[in-house]
Amino acid sequence: MVTHALRVGNTFGLAVFRAGAGYALRMAPRRIVSLVPSLTEALFAFGVGERVVGRTRYCTQPPRCVGGVEKVGGTKKVDVGRVLDLEPDLVVAVREENARESVEALRAAGVPIFLGAPETVADALEMLEKLAGIVEAPRAEAVIGPIERVYEGLRRARPVRRPRTFVPIWKGPYMGVGSDTYVHDVIEVSGGENVCGAHTRYPIVSPEEIEAFQPEVVLLPDEPYPFSAEDLAEFYALDIPAAHGDRIHLVDGKLLTWYGPRMAGSLRQLSALLRLP
């Protein structure tokens, strides 16, 4: 019997890792549908990829492994009927990425749901540990151990000064990341000071407000909004230290938003970008 409980909290009324009573699966799941791209990658890294029978069209990693896995729609628009046809004994979802309606429909159909709600790097680590336990992952330590070591190293490092950092996740209008988001904690753990940290969720900010923030580093991710080289000129035109010091960087959005095996490398890369000369 799998003894790792899925704790039922008040988010969606489903399984989240926060508070409340729990229930346990009777055995390790054999037919898993993942609705979260980064956790699909994690399941393969854990050594249980052969049990993944369904994925979203955005679950593209690892590319050599997911090609033969059935697609069940997108992260927000899941084909619930297709998921049920696959007869899963576990569906993996995350509050921030998946639509409440889809997850509730699957739960109502009696499908066990693993629903994570990570708002910090520590939350993400706990989520990975719980998922690894539930699926009885043979390679859990190989995946999670390096992340824990990098995370603890960065926590101990405590930079003398944290550069003011702006990370937009959208354009038209620009949207930053507030203090209750996973990206905020990634910035802070990596050594930066999120200039939108006084806000919650995803605040809309104008170019004038960005100038008022006076960010020393700007990171432009390629997801969810696909910032590209064409957007650099708009930020270099602003009167901000990041422009004067040539510290406006295009980055892979997965560095900021993906949980799983790439977290250790992501934190290392971000800490290097946020280290002032």
What does each model-identified segment do?
Residues 12-277:
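N-terminal ligand-binding lobe of clamshell/alpha-beta domains
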Residues 2-3, 10:
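Short terminal hydrophobic/aromatic SLiMs and anchors at protein ends
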Residues 3-5, 15:
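Short linear motifs in low-complexity or flexible loops
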Residues 6-7, 23:
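Compositionally biased, low-complexity segments enriched in small residues
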